Amino acid sequence: MSTILDRIKAYKLEEIEARKAERPLVAVEDAARAAPAPRGFARALSAAAATGYGLIAEIKKASPSKGLIREDFDVPALARAYEAGGATCLSVLTDGPSFQGADEFLRQAHDAVKLPCLRKDFIYDTYQVAEARALGADCILIIMASVSDSQALELEAAASQWGMDVLVEVHSREELARAEHLKSRLIGINNRNLDTFEVSLDVTRDLARRVPEDRLIVSESGLYTPDDLADLARYGARCFLIGESLMRQQDVEAATRAILAAPLTSQGGI
């Protein structure tokens, strides 16, 4: 029986081939070279985490599990609200079929603010990495559950070639062990199981203490309150990717500021 991730991968691979036929790689690479210099995604998170929390605020219109999340979807306005609310970086969904995202959303968000931006998509091909840079992305996502070790290495190398950072996403101890063979410092612990889309913060509680000290933990999914952040900080998480809970708020700037008000709890005692 196919999972949600299986179905996403199937259509994404078809989409990649269609895009290659429509726009040759050389044209994408020319656009990538002409894009503004990367803004330093990992550097910004590391600086924020040194004194408090690093927040990757996500611009997401819909999801496979929740359907439409936000009807009033003005990307530049949302990006500016996140920036004003204290976000460190942005994550922008560009997948269309499952998340109602679009490449243009990433471009709009990048141009509206000075924050580093993550292209949030299902990346399988170096063509998509060049696309990300051409769109203004400063970081890409590699989902270990959906790629082989050799694919992950190839995608990471391509991102590095374009001066971008990589957020390496894991959901299990096995995936974390595989991720440790990559050079990327950012380890995203997804509290959502991408096969079932069920969410549990216990995933971060379990994996965070197993992440090498030279890596920076980003806890993703299922984060709704300042207490959630304070709780996971006790396990070593200092950075968080939050989308749905902020997207559902009428005043996104105020909601962003409020969730960052969590008192920073020192690691230990668990």
From Swiss-Prot:
Q: What is the protein's species of origin?
A: Cereibacter sphaeroides (strain ATCC 17025 / ATH 2.4.3) (Rhodobacter sphaeroides)
The gene it comes from is trpC
What family is reported? Answer: Belongs to the TrpC family.
Q: Which reaction does it catalyse?
A: 1-(2-carboxyphenylamino)-1-deoxy-D-ribulose 5-phosphate + H(+) = (1S,2R)-1-C-(indol-3-yl)glycerol 3-phosphate + CO2 + H2O
What UniProt keywords are attached to this protein's entry?
Amino-acid biosynthesis, Aromatic amino acid biosynthesis, Decarboxylase, Lyase, Tryptophan biosynthesis
The pathway it acts in is: Amino-acid biosynthesis; L-tryptophan biosynthesis; L-tryptophan from chorismate: step 4/5
Amino-acid biosynthesis listed as a keyword: yes
- What this protein is called in its record is Indole-3-glycerol phosphate synthase
Stored SUPFAM superfamilies:
Ribulose-phoshate binding barrel
Record EC number: 4.1.1.48
Instruction: List residues traversing the bilayer.
Output: none
